[in-house]
């Protein structure tokens, strides 16, 4: 497994295993250290397995349903929904390739698969993580253009597909050096104790083998900048601009408000809260893992600290990062009314308050996540003397913003249902 995403691929095994129920024997003047096959007691391993199983199920079910809904419903073939579809696909790859192998890495010693699987799994893991992060940026850019610059031409479906191809191309290019350097290596001074009958086995590990340690540091720094720091900066800046723009227009809706004006103002508040949620989730999910990886490469930690970090803290950091792929379907999909209705329609779920299918079809066509007309305002609006429909805070200078707020409220994750 690529050591960028696993937890135990340290080059200093003597630091990790020191004091971890090891025995030393001398063979041909070589100090052999025996380590247990299972890294944890059954109770601790059970906690790891149940925790990873939970996010794995959420990731697989949630992202599969999102893919099914977008592909099945033609009225949802829009720019933002295609980005959400791409996000779901990349998150599915995270669930398939990252979660199980990382869990295995956290509970057993060594690499149980061959050399080819070492390179393939490491490459796919890195690509899926990078593609997921880059897609979050693409969604932020799409929303930013629509809200802050509503008069600029909207992205077309063709442009969205080109963007998606670029996303995967960049992800492959960034992670290729890691795949090239990944090799399965034998741990000459360690053997795994397989049973109580003193049966042992050679320890193999899948890790990056750089010619110089400085090259590894440089590559880790490049990954940190391109997969975390730069995307985080872009997401925070663009969502801050979106929030400021919505807050500015919401200020015009103060004082005496008609019910519809109050409703639009509340929608703006919900969107602003949603934007803060997106940025905070991204920061909190990935910051611990990147902090640990940078610490591992740039600091000299004591053997005891290294052991604690690799055996206990790294698994939690990976779990937290993978949680982002599990909650993405919720915050980007199921808080969207179209996705909820599509879910009900796809699986023929009848609820007491469900509207007739004809009404849903009409509403779904009107609620397309991103449209180019800018004239589809869902709420009742007032009319000016010239006959133009205007909502609170909407003027001839910005006739599309209320439409975009409606769409943002539908298309994006919201903390308020």
Swiss-Prot record:
Residues 67-82, 141-160, 239-274, 332-417 are cytoplasmic. The chain crosses the membrane at residues 46-66, 83-103, 120-140, 161-181, 218-238, 275-295, 311-331. The keyword Disulfide bond applies. Glycans are attached at residues 8, 20, 31, 198. Disulfide bonds join 118-206. Residues 382-401 are annotated as: Disordered. Keywords: Cell membrane, Disulfide bond, G-protein coupled receptor, Glycoprotein, Membrane, Receptor, Transducer, Transmembrane, Transmembrane helix. One of its GO terms (molecular function) is neuropeptide receptor activity. InterPro entries: GPCR_Rhodpsn, GPCR_Rhodpsn_7TM, NPFF_rcpt, NPFF_rcpt_2. The keyword tRNA-binding does not apply. One of its GO terms (biological process) is regulation of MAPK cascade. Residues 1-45, 104-119, 182-217, 296-310 are extracellular. It is found in: Cell membrane. It is a multi-pass membrane protein. One of its GO terms (cellular component) is actin cytoskeleton. Receptor for NPAF (A-18-F-amide) and NPFF (F-8-F-amide) neuropeptides, also known as morphine-modulating peptides. Can also be activated by a variety of naturally occurring or synthetic FMRF-amide like ligands. This receptor mediates its action by association with G proteins that activate a phosphatidylinositol-calcium second messenger system. PANTHER family: NEUROPEPTIDE FF RECEPTOR 2, NEUROPEPTIDE RECEPTOR-RELATED G-PROTEIN COUPLED RECEPTOR. Belongs to the G-protein coupled receptor 1 family. This is Neuropeptide FF receptor 2. The lineage of its organism: Eukaryota, Metazoa, Chordata, Craniata, Vertebrata. The gene is Npffr2.
